[in-house]
Amino acid sequence: MASSVEDQQLQQEEAESVKDVQSHYLRCPSPSFSMMSDRFSTVSDRFSVISGSEAESIFMEPIHLSSTIAAKKIISEELPPRPARVSSPPDSALEPAQQLMVEDLYSRVQELLDERSLYNTPCVLDIQRALLRDRLEAPLSPVDEVWPNVFIAEKSVAVNKGRLKRLGITHVLNAAHGTGVYTGPLFYSGMNIHYMGIEVDDFPDADISPHFRSCAEFLDDALLTHRGKVLVDSMMGVSRSAVLVAAYLMIFQNMSIMEALLEIRKKRAISPNEGFIKQLRQLNETLMEERDEDDDETLSQCSVIDARGRLEEQESVFGVKADSIMVEEEEDGGGSVISSVASSAAAAALRAGVQCGSQQPNMQQPADQPSLPGQTREDEDGDVDRMILEWQKRNEKYQSEDWWEAQLLCEDEDDGEDKTQRAVRPDDLESVTSEDVRMVKERIGRRPRRAASLAGSTSSCSSYVDLWKQRLQELEEQAAARHRLQDQDTSSETQQKKIDDDVQSILSDSSSMYNFCKKNKENLTPLERWKIKRIQFGWNKKENAENGEQSEAEPAAAPDLEDVNLTAYQTWKLKQQKKHGGEENKEEILQMSRGEDTATARRRQRREEVLERSRRNLQESQSVCGWETESALSSSIPLSAFCAGAFPSASVCGDDSMSVLSGRSSVLSGRSTRSLPPAVLETPAPPTPVLGPNGEQMVNIANIQNWIASVVNETLQQKQTEMLMGASVAPSRAGSVFSAGRGVDDDKSSVLSGLSASTGLSRSRAESVVSVGAKARSVLSAAGRAESVFSAGGASQLSCGSRKSKITTTSVPLYSLFQDQVNLHKLDTMEKEIKSDMRDKMASYEIKKITEDNKRSTLYKKKKPKEDDEDVDIAKSNGLEELEARTCEKPKPKRDYGRSGILNLPASANNPTSSIDEWLEHVRPPSSKPRVYDGDSGPIRMSRPAYEELQEPSGLDFTSRRSSVSVEVDEEEDYSFRFSSRNCADDDLDPELSYSSRRSPSFNGLSESTSFASRRSYSRYEDEERSSFQNHSIKQKSSVYEDSGRTAGSRRDEEEDEEISAFIAQIKQRARARVAEEMEDDEVLTAWRKQEESKSHDHK
């Protein structure tokens, strides 16, 4: 509908315009005539499809035929032609976007893979793969020297003037001038730097090729003329700057595109975009073509120059000299290159030889031989012009297929001729390109043999000929190989030959091993791969050589000392020997350079370790007997006399550390000052050291152990009398007796070595000699106390059991002879048990200390209700009786076999006065008075005491604690005095030492609860206590001196039970408070989790 309406509108407009023209040009505006003109206009429209020639003839008719026709002609000239409407194709006929993208991608890949090139230039994709071969896409340094005095850098280096001065840059080439790096000549003013900038964007469609020549000339001028250093910079220094440097290398260093880019890639990671690489490929093609043209022109000019030089030589020298031409051969690779002058002269000599008819054996001179200097110049000029014309036709000769066939045929004829006579070969046209030379070759090729006199003059063979010959040989070999492969059967024979060829390639070139294994990865068995590996590394040759040497059984000649590889120390040692006049011993040098295998080295190292451990154990035994200081007290022979040569003495520090670690130091470390001189015992013979193959000492460990056991056995028998005398000494005096007169030997006498401990054991109880409980601490500690490791019970057992037992073989207690067999697990168990025991004791003492502190506090005395006098008297009497009962009934410590069984040793419980008990008796408990705080310091925070960690407060053994501590009245008074005097000094203690807790007040000896009333009462008394604290302490001192021992003891016992019950109740209340608080925390957590879950559900 729309199109029809438009047509109607156009027709109406056209009719109006026709009427206007008619009224303007025609003289008869009558209505009838106008109607008639309308009819004729429609007729003319109907016949307007007539061809151009016919329409022209119609319109060229005279005007009198019809005025309407004339009007139509005028209208067609005045009005523009109607434009033809082109119907737009529907959307369904258009290509979809996906298809267009695929086609675009395909075209891009085609451009990247385009390898069309006359000079085998690689495609863009291959170049990009070569540049990104090692997966390093970004440079590691902001600036790198990619070519001598040529640096590629990023923007940060280009704008750093100080760094440019340090680098010594004299020229700057900015590849991003105005497009990222905004520098210029004004920026580098005053630095004596020449600047050049090009404005190129780093886009694939950017054209950087117009700047290749100018930038390369700038670089060449900077390097050659100014002898300077050039910085080529861009934004990142990977694309634009790298392309410009590559263009310089291609233009002025005659490199190909791959050589230039890889040369830069060696020093810096570069990544030019695709468009720049395409432009570099085009530059590479252009340069290759120019070089070929230059080579052709150079060859043509050289040929002309050589010809003129030859004619001048003929003018000055007789033409006979042409037969004796001096040929300069330069060996380069495998072919010889002959100079063009000699080749031209050889061509003239050949032409002369052909004309003279050299087939005759007498070699007569021809008539038309080149004339002497008297010859006319016209012939010579004509020859030169003819040679020039022939040289200029060589390109047509290259393009001729007949010429290539002639070359191949000539090669075949060369192969068929006799090897003694050298055949004619096509010479290189770069050196000899004249028509005469070709004619000579053709004529000589038709003859059966050449003349011997001309063999030297035609012996030139160029590099191209050698290349052709090599290529033909390769083609023949390939053809022969294909022929053999076709004839051969596809059976095991073919596979075996293939393997043989591969093995041959492996033997010739080890680098082909990877390709061979890659091709035959699935076909080879592990044994075959192992054999090939042996071939690759040359093990088979070594074995064959060794077998050959063994079969010949001839003494090998001594190698040259210069070929011997020595270490730096060995070389220095030889130089020192020569310097001081020593002679060079060849056998010693070879022995030093001969590397020993790992097994021998391990055996030698093991022997050295065994020897060292043996020496240390012997030194321990020696230190037990004390040969250094008390050799006069005993007449036995020292151990060092047995093995003076084999076992050198070790240091005292080594003895001490070794014996402490091994845990086998003898319990006989204490030496008695009252020992009697025993009878001389028969000394066991020491083990004889066995010499190894290299002169080293071979040690038999079993013999050494037995020998040590026998020596120790005899020594212990000698010392038994001394120990019997030491057993009668009181336990409290044993340490001083055994360590009397020993100030220097404390380290030797305090070490643990159970090597000789088993000698004093009875057969029924062979595991109890040394105490480990509380006394082991004095031996292991570094306090330097010279306490004895023997208890009274242990000494008596030793004296009783030594008469019955005798060591015959090496005993096997917990720790064996050497250090590496120590059972560390048992040592850790023993240490943990000792620590736990000490922890329990300290916890009980802490509770006791707190009770003692609280019963003397002022606050407790004020809160304590007054009792009746009768009750006080009863309590005093009861307390006195209990105190006397406790002092009289001091139970002896029980023997604890739990810890002693770990070391198979007796417990040290027989000594009633242990060092721990003595130390704990004098422990001064710190004051439990709370820290005085100011009013504005906030609420008082008390820390939880350490005894809150106890899970079972009712399980505390307070009765055993009271029974184990024996405190007399005097000691109690002294203790209370010391404690009261410490109260004053404890006022300024650190608040961290006070017991602070948010939920529980300090323990004050009462039956406390966690109620608010107790806290309020505590705070009320605190202010009063602050004001009169010092007075209370002074009064307490005087009251302690006035009270009798009975009153103090009875009152303490009575109050102690109440305090313990209050303490237990307090612990239970705190535990319940903690549990309640944890429950509240759990409820808060659960509520929070439910809220979070509801929020997450709402979000979902």
From Swiss-Prot:
Null allele phenotype: At 2 dpf, morphants are morphologically normal but show pericardial edema and tail curvature. They exhibit near complete paralysis at embryonic and larval stages, producing extremely low levels of spontaneous coiling movements and a greatly diminished touch response. They show a severe disorganization of the contractile apparatus in muscle fibers. Sarcomeric structures in mutants are almost entirely absent and only rare triads are observed.
Biological process (GO), any one: negative regulation of MAPK cascade
Keywords, alphabetical: Cytoplasm
Biased composition (Low complexity): 667-676
InterPro entries named in the record: Atypical_DUSP_subfamA, Dual-sp_phosphatase_cat-dom, Prot-tyrosine_phosphatase-like, Tyr_Pase_dom, TYR_PHOSPHATASE_DUAL_dom
A Pfam family: DSPc
Subcellular location: Cytoplasm, Myofibril, Sarcomere
GO MF terms held by the record: MAP kinase phosphatase activity; protein tyrosine/serine/threonine phosphatase activity
Every Tyrosine-protein phosphatase domain range: 141-289
Cellular component per GO, a single term: cytoplasm
Region entry Disordered, spans: 1-21, 356-383, 411-436, 479-504, 542-561, 575-615, 667-686, 888-1060, 1075-1100
Family: Belongs to the protein-tyrosine phosphatase family. Non-receptor class dual specificity subfamily.
Stated role: Required for myofiber maturation.
Protein name, per record: Serine/threonine/tyrosine-interacting-like protein 2
